[in-house]
Amino acid sequence: MKKNLFALLLICMAIPLMAQESQTTYNFLRLPTSAHAAALGGDNITLIEDDEALIFHNPALLSTVSDRSLCLGYMNYMSGSQVASAAFNRIIRERATVAVSAQYAHYGTMKQMDENHVQTGEFSAKDIALSGYFSYLLTDRLAGGIAAKFITSYIGDYNSFAVGVDLGLNYYDPDREWSVSLVAKNLGGQLKSYDEQYESMPIDVQAGVSKRFANTPFRVSASLIDLNHWDYKFIYHWVLGVDLLLSKSIWVGGGYNCRRANEMKILGVDDEEGSHGAGLSLGAGINLERLKLNLAYGKYHVSSSSVLINFAYTL
């Protein structure tokens, strides 16, 4: 059974690598949900922490979360957008854990105009995702996880609906403090489109590694994102981060997202492109036995940044 599950996960992860890039929807699913992951560049799938928010990035990491943990998250995003999340888990067997989560993104109220640019009213836009998770320790060091998502989106009077799946694997060596992960996110499709044109899911295949250096407080992380698309430079697939672990309970960290920095470049006064800090992120957290608080700041654009906070409590 374990071998069959492991093989199925690997096969399903390989499918998106053959997919072609196209217009995608539900891109709120790409946003960081864990403040710790956000601090390390926004995409991290390898952190071994008692941090339930990390399951949004890799469902296999659910195996490291304490039983009956409740996690709440909030992020203010660009242009006044707001994103909230919640998750709760239960350990159902010695090696098996389940969880449920919700994500909500609201993009504010906008003017509704006709073809003559006359305002006829206002409309709002929002996205919602409800998910169920299952993780299992295949061996003492290898965990697998799956998340099933039900996603809906509203733009004024228009609505769409989709289903998706995340698949994740994590290998952790506690003796050498190596963590290696592979994840395929948002496999699935639309069941109902806004109009007659169906759009693709934001599929994202990622691989990552984290390593804490012996006898030091430093842990480094490197992730490769969007491995199913190779139409841009290899360097822009990298997300890099470093933690300073001040104690078993306190961390501070920083990261750099190469893709975000490239996408947010603008022309300066000398007509040369620059990211002006876009792609950089910072964060800190305190994780006690039952109470956890993590905070991250991310620079998305020269004129826009984001703050993400997670609060978790073990019941």
Feature map (PLM): residue ranges:
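Positively charged n-region of N-terminal signal peptides that target proteins for export
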Residues: 1-4, 140
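Sec-dependent N-terminal signal peptides
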Residues: 4-14
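Sec/Tat signal peptide C-region and signal peptidase I cleavage site
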Residues: 15-19
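Subset of outer-membrane beta-barrel
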Residues: 20-315
